[in-house]
Design a protein with these regions (language model features):
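Generic alpha-helical secondary structure signal
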Residues: 3-4, 65-69, 94, 225, ...
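Short, solvent-exposed polar/charged micro-motifs at secondary-structure junctions
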Residues: 93-96, 250-252, 416
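Generic structural signal for bulky hydrophobic/aromatic residues embedded
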Residues: 41, 103, 111, 206, ...
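Flexible helical/loop "lid" subdomain adjacent to adenine-nucleotide binding pockets
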Residues: 117, 125-177, 183-331
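Bulky hydrophobic/aromatic packing residues
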Residues: 36-41, 84-93, 120-121, 213-219, ...
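AMP-forming adenylation/ATP pyrophosphatase catalytic core
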Residues: 6, 13-26, 52, 87, ...
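ATP-dependent adenylation/nucleotidyltransferase module used to activate substrates
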Residues: 1-196, 225, 233, 444
Length: 495
């Protein structure tokens, strides 16, 4: 029974090109079951991988150190390598659960890199998945009035056809009123889908951490009780975390309200939501490929598309996506902001219009839409030796040099001097967007890596353009979308 359970949980592709796997093991029933199931499965392979069990001691409860040692003893008795890592430093007073989650995954990634492991597995179960769905669903229901208001605005205030009208220079009606009504209906429904099913797809089985370490949760389809039965059959005990019964936590209250039948019903909804999210991601990716989009020197330009494309219900989402990526935002636009963006874009005029949104300047005219980083709140920072800094949500700078470097936005005077005195030839330079580019400097001079092919003053520095919403954790459900967008921001400069 145990071997059959293990074989049904894993795919051959889970362990492809992998020499070591990090298992996050807290000592609870879920993670201990994961530990032994992975061990049993790997023993059936011709070339078993090395298992490294990692316990994260968040140092939030006095029992945590003892629990980590208990896990270490269990691992020693089964000849499994075990490491305890600790969340050091001052802990936040609010949002402790989400902060602990970020710290936990960061520590796991650090240990994976240290151990030369390309895969992390965690013991999230079907119960975790259903609880997450229920919590998110309840939050959406609480905001139902707001969402209804948004839908009303979508019906009455804009339509995808508005993009066509604006580019044709029309004022008022779109011409084909039946088509306009149908488009308004479609964009309301489909944009609701793009946004709301993203969250309700909940925890993905596979994701990418820091754009380099695979994260797999193989137990998402298994009930917690099944895993406990599996452990009990083998005579193995687990640690019960007392916070799992503390009704001060929303998840505990939701957990205690779920019946077995409700668990099964919600599981079906989650699977459907995940399929929809994957399809929406593919639809958005297909639209991006069909559009004429250029990203260069801090400026994105979406050329006026053919009629069929700018009436596509995903078009506003694409504009919002590139606004976030150009503006350095860490999150995709929520429904309310997306609907407001579309209202602003539906300008029935052929003249140039400009507004700021999501930290981005959006300029709209008969030729298309231009987007670049808004020229404020780009703060200077220091990157010390052997430090990595994410600057402005757009650049990741790693300093392997012998001295600290200063990073900030490109200066107008220095930009003009650079363009005048270097061999760099830029026809009709757009200085507002050029000023959003990263500049590194010290007392000896400055360097704008995207404009200069060779380092002027800095050595041993790596600069990478990132997509903040997908940089820390990227869901497998969004793979089609991320794979299409990534080449637009595929900049890595090594000095």
């Amino acid at each position: 029974v145990c071997v059959r359970l293990a074989r049904n949980l894993f795919k051959t592709s889970d362990f492809i090109q992998c020499r070591r796997v990090i298992l996050a093991v807290s000592g609870g029933s879920d993670s201990l079951a994961l530990l032994f199931l992975v061990k049993e499965y790997l023993e059936t392979l011709s070339a078993p991988l090395e298992i490294i069990a990692v316990t994260v001691d968040h140092q939030l409860r006095k029992e945590s150190a003892r629990e980590a040692e208990t896990v270490a003893k269990i691992c020693r008795s089964h000849h499994i390598k075990h490491i305890t890592v600790r969340w050091e430093g001052k802990k936040p007073k609010t949002h402790i659960a989400s902060s602990a989650r970020v710290a936990r995954y960061n520590l796991l990634v650090q240990e994976a890199q240290k151990q030369g492991a390309s895969l992390i597995m965690t013991g999230h179960t079907l119960n975790d998945q259903v609880e997450t769905y229920q919590m998110r669903s309840q939050r959406l229901q609480k905001r139902r009035g707001l969402l209804d208001d948004d839908a009303s605005v979508m019906r009455d205030g804009f339509s995808a056809g508005g993009f066509a009208g604006a580019w044709r220079g029309e004022v008022g009606a779109m011409g084909d009123e039946d088509h306009a009504k149908e488009t308004r209906k479609n964009i309301t429904e489909k944009n609701d889908g793009v946004l709301y099913e993203r969250g309700l797809s909940c925890i993905p089985r596979e994701a990418l951490l820091h754009r380099k370490i695979r994260l797999i949760r193989p137990l998402l389809g298994v009930k917690r009780q099944t895993l406990r039965n599996y452990l009990s059959i083998q005579g193995k005990m687990w640690i019960d975390d007392p916070t799992n019964e503390d009704r001060n936590f929303e998840r505990v209250r939701v957990r205690q309200s779920l019946s077995s039948q409700k668990l099964a019903d919600i599981a079906q909804k989650i699977n459907q939501a995940a399929l929809q999210r994957r399809q929406h991601a593919q639809n958005i990716a297909d639209l991006i490929l069909a559009l004429d989009i250029r990203v260069q020197y801090g400026r994105c330009f979406i050329k006026k598309p053919a009629s069929l494309l700018h009436k596509n219900a995903c078009f506003p989402f694409v504009v919002g996506l590139f606004a976030v990526l150009m503006g350095g935002g860490f999150y995709l636009l929520p429904s309310k902001k997306l609907s407001m963006l579309v209202q602003k874009l539906c300008l029935h005029s052929s003249e140039k219009q400009r507004f700021t949104y999501a930290g981005c300047v959006i300029e709209y005219n008969k030729d298309g839409i231009a987007l670049w980083r808004e020229g404020r709140n780009m703060k200077e920072a220091l990157v010390g030796t052997e430090e990595t800094l994410i600057w402005d949500g757009r650049y990741k700078i790693t300093n392997h040099g012998s001295e600290a470097i200063k990073v900030g936005a490109a200066n107008l005077e220095q930009l003009k001097s650079l363009l005048k005195n270097s061999n760099f030839n830029l026809e009709k330079p757009h200085f507002p967007s050029l000023q959003s580019l990263l500049m590194i400097s010290n007392d000896k001079g400055y360097d704008i890596p995207e404009l200069i092919s060779q380092a002027i003053i800095h050595k041993n520095v790596i600069i990478k353009r990132i997509m903040a919403p997908f940089d820390w954790l990227s869901s497998r459900e969004d793979a089609a979308l991320v794979n299409v967008v990534e080449p637009f921001f595929n900049l890595e400069v090594k000095r």
